[in-house]
Design a protein with these regions (language model features):
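N-terminal segments that mediate ammonia production and transfer
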Residues: 1-120
Length: 120
């Protein structure tokens, strides 16, 4: 666990001035992009370690260097009976030419793949 990064989970509610969920999603996207750029501008020593797997009102994306059997223990909210989801997707990265590390763990916002997309 020495290599494990700090993980923070935030929840942002839609304000009264945002008319619908689509507008809220657009606002969250802009907030995430601005914050990512600001982190680089601020010259934070470990800026490369800042990563937002998701900032969405529709999806939760978790990042971890885990096996499938470790998910429920590491992210206990996935076992909470109050958390309702239509879908859960897990991708396990098995390094073939690099040493496993947290920064290489796959956090997919939209798609999971093996890193070799070569056809459309």
């Amino acid at each position: 666990l020495e290599a494990e990064p700090d993980i923070w989970q935030v929840f942002i509610s839609r304000g009264a001035g945002i008319p619908d969920q689509d507008a809220f999603e657009r606002r969250l996207y802009v907030i995430r992009k601005r914050f990512e750029k600001a982190i680089q501008r601020w010259g934070i020593r470990d800026a490369d370690w800042f990563y937002f797997p998701s900032l969405s009102s529709r999806t939760l994306v978790y990042k971890g260097m885990l096996t499938a059997t470790q998910l429920r223990t590491y992210f206990p909210d996935l076992s909470d009976r109050h958390l309702i989801s239509a879908l859960a997707m897990f991708h396990s990265r098995f390094s073939t030419n690099t040493f496993p590390s947290w920064e290489l763990a796959h956090p997919y916002r939209m798609i999971a793949h093996n890193g070799e997309i070569n056809t459309l």
